[in-house]
């Protein structure tokens, strides 16, 4: 019996050449609407879907393939005598190949001016039904949803006269991934339209960006997936201009660096190691900002990741060139800067649109057996809600240092303490099990620079021991959430030493 293929695609990439190949193999081709028109315009002989169904395409194409003559031909088990007898009795013929991809729902809702009606009209019904039917019966039906698979199928047909069973199974698995992702986009769109924050089920879809050499450690496998819609200010959608491919750890660190540098509107540079900032500097230009970020911790910056929120110029590039770095991320690089930095063949240079999100996106964290979902912590300091419980208020310079430290501390692993002075961090205490331990690390790192500096804490002081350490180091201003039952003890210590202290009322834990 002559084999038949059904072709109906929205993405017409390579379809003319593929159908030509099918016809050359003696396969009869059925097609619909715009696909049929394109094939005929290219001189290919195809059969209209209405000739198979005996029913016209109706309702603006909404109903054309939803017919027993199509789905019977797709779902019939060819070695089941009952199925074959029923097909013969009803005048049905088997369909052996399905080449279908779906209405461009993703592309439609990505348009800034999309209407709800446009989105709904681009929900495909017949396409998913056909490819699911074909994939279920993949022992007998080859189903292709991705133009990248056209050559594989044609090659096997030319060599073997048929598609290998293993290939059919792989194609079927791809179909169900394809429809699952498609339905996830639709369900998420409708859920967002209804303003539902915590639906009873959560379906997410990501697209493979690249395989990674390994994960956090060489014995772990890893892959990088990106969100289906371009998050322009992200590592996933950054453009790599130079250097080795990104590693798992590179991606994590680059993401952390980007998150911090987005906090600043003035020229800023952030240096990150193991997802914690080791140096942050701001200045009148990017060269000055980098100089301060470097001076914040000239030891830890070695082998680090740098993020800048302004173009890298030649002078800054020459300073960056002096030390070993893994990655430099910036909105752009001047031509002269690229010439300087590209002399280091392994240095990764990324460009990305650096802008702070206007609304909090969802952050997904996997735990054993489950998934935690929360809003990203994008909350900025609201000066209208702060309080100053101490006798002394911060000076203008102290305020400047406090704000810088507060922007940084929320990106440091808890318990987190950050010291800042003169437009740069001078000490970072991260990830300790008690707050005073983190304070001691930050103070030790700052050394003599701690004198006259500002301290930020991501959470309140459960007791005044951190304040005692700060006072001994000569720290003159502190910003913290407040809210401890022992706040009064901390306030008394601050007043004793003449420290100005600000309560924000907002905690910034980071785990």
From Swiss-Prot:
Record domain MGS-like: where: 1-145
Catalytic activity: (6R)-10-formyltetrahydrofolate + 5-amino-1-(5-phospho-beta-D-ribosyl)imidazole-4-carboxamide = 5-formamido-1-(5-phospho-D-ribosyl)imidazole-4-carboxamide + (6S)-5,6,7,8-tetrahydrofolate; IMP + H2O = 5-formamido-1-(5-phospho-D-ribosyl)imidazole-4-carboxamide
SUPFAM superfamilies: Cytidine deaminase-like, Methylglyoxal synthase-like
GO molecular function: IMP cyclohydrolase activity; phosphoribosylaminoimidazolecarboxamide formyltransferase activity
Disulfide-linked positions: none
InterPro entries reported for this sequence: AICAR_Tfase_dup_dom_sf (IPR024051), Cytidine_deaminase-like (IPR016193), MGS-like_dom (IPR011607), MGS-like_dom_sf (IPR036914), PurH-like (IPR002695)
PANTHER family tied to this protein: BIFUNCTIONAL PURINE BIOSYNTHESIS PROTEIN ATIC, BIFUNCTIONAL PURINE BIOSYNTHESIS PROTEIN PURH
Protein name as annotated: Bifunctional purine biosynthesis protein PurH
Organism of this sequence: Bacillus cereus (strain ZK / E33L)
Gene from which this protein is expressed: purH
């Amino acid at each position: 019996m002559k084999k038949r293929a059904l072709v109906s695609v929205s993405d017409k990439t390579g379809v003319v050449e593929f159908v030509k190949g099918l016809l050359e193999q003696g396969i009869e081709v059925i097609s619909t609407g715009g696909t049929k028109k394109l094939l005929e315009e290219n001189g290919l002989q195809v059969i209209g879907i209405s000739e198979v169904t005996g029913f016209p395409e109706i309702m603006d194409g909404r109903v054309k393939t939803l017919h027993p003559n199509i789905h019977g031909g797709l779902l019939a088990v060819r070695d089941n005598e009952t199925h074959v007898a029923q097909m013969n009795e009803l005048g049905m013929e088997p369909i052996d190949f399905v080449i279908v991809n779906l209405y461009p729902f993703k592309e439609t809702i990505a348009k800034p001016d999309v209407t709800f009606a446009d989105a709904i009209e681009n929900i495909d019904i017949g396409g998913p039904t056909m490819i699911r039917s074909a994939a279920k019966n993949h022992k007998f039906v080859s189903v292709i949803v991705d133009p990248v698979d056209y050559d594989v199928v044609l090659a096997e047909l030319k060599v073997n006269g048929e598609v290998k069973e293993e290939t059919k199974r792989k194609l079927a698995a791809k179909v169900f991934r394809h429809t699952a992702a498609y339905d996830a986009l639709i369900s998420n769109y409708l859920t967002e339209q209804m303003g539902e924050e915590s639906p009873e089920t959560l379906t997410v879809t990501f697209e493979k960006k690249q395989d990674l050499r390994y994960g956090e450690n060489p014995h772990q496998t890893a892959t990088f997936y990106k969100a289906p819609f371009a998050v322009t200010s992200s590592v996933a959608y950054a453009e790599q201009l130079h250097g080795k491919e990104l590693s798992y750890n590179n991606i994590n660190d680059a993401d952390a660096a980007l998150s911090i540098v987005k906090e600043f509107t003035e020229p800023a540079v952030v240096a990150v190691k193991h997802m914690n900032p080791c140096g942050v500097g701001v200045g009148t230009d990017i060269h000055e900002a980098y100089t301060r970020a470097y001076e914040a911790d000239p030891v830890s910056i070695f082998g680090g990741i740098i993020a800048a929120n302004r173009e890298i110029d030649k002078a800054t590039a020459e300073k960056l060139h002096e030390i070993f770095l893994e990655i430099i991320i910036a909105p752009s690089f001047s031509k002269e800067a690229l010439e300087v930095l590209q002399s280091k063949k392994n240095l990764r240079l990324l460009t990305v649109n650096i802008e702070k999100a206007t609304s909090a996106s969802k952050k997904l964290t996997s735990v054993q057996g489950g998934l935690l979902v929360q809003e990203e912590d994008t909350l900025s300091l609201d000066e209208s809600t702060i309080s100053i419980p101490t006798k002394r208020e911060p000076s203008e310079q102290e305020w400047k240092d406090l704000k810088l430290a507060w922007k940084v501390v929320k990106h440091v692993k808890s318990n987190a303490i950050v010291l800042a002075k003169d437009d740069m961090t001078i000490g970072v205490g991260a990830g300790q099990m008690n707050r005073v331990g983190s304070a001691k690390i930050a103070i030790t790192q700052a050394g003599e620079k701690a004198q006259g500096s500002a301290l930020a804490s991501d959470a309140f002081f459960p007791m005044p021991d951190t304040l005692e350490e700060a006072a001994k180091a000569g720290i003159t201003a502190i910003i913290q959430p407040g809210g401890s039952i022992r706040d009064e003890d901390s306030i008394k210590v601050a007043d004793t030493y003449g420290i100005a202290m600000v309560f924000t009322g907002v905690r910034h834990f980071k785990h």
